[in-house]
Amino acid sequence: APVAQEGN
């Protein structure tokens, strides 16, 4: 399952 990632 995809993991939520904030910022870049």
UniProtKB/Swiss-Prot annotation:
Entry superkingdom: Bacteria
Note: Found specifically in cells cultured chemolithotrophically.
Protein name: Chemolithotroph-specific protein
Species: Thiomonas delicata
